């Protein structure tokens, strides 16, 4: 399978080179993106790209981050947008956005009366609290656990879910407190049912990176342009 990817990639790279010599009239750019992240990132990114390269065919592959890394390692993609950390750290990557986590508190939670005048809270306010978190193999869970390290386990996880959207909806139904990436807090708006607080002096962020199948210096012109667009857009969208 690895060699099949490599042969296909060689053919597409040759097509892209001819495309560059012919004012970008044709070519294929294979982009990987993790589930959910695609709907948040790609619309405005690809709209700008299509304006400049209207005849480049975009082949979008949506899979889990590890699957995308494996495809990159085998040459099956030109680039992928994934969150860190990487399973294959030898792949060239560049962070283009860092998303802070927020404390999501249900509107009717009794502690809201204590916190309601504040915009940011120390993570220590979560001591002894019942929390909703994504499952252990999810990268959002890994980041949440890093944020919670100062508590030394002094909290109780009452519900786990594969989906961060499910966690947000459960928190909005007064099921417990959660830690939510800011971009998802904006994407899955629950109105006034959730109160969000920033975390004081928290160095931990959810890092998003563009990962390449080879040295970024060897990227085709359209690939470089897509990377440039990613670097210039200010997220969260």
Label the model's feature ranges.
Residues 1-26:
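Alpha-helical "hinge/linker" immediately C-terminal to small N-terminal DNA-binding modules
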Residues 21, 44-48, 65-106, 114-115, ...:
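Short beta-strand-centered segments that line the small-molecule binding cleft or hinge
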Residues 26-89, 152, 160-161:
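Central regulatory/effector-binding core of bacterial HTH transcription factors
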Residues 64-77, 82-83, 139-195:
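Hydrophobic hinge/microswitch elements
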Residues 88-95, 99, 165-215:
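Beta-alpha-beta core module
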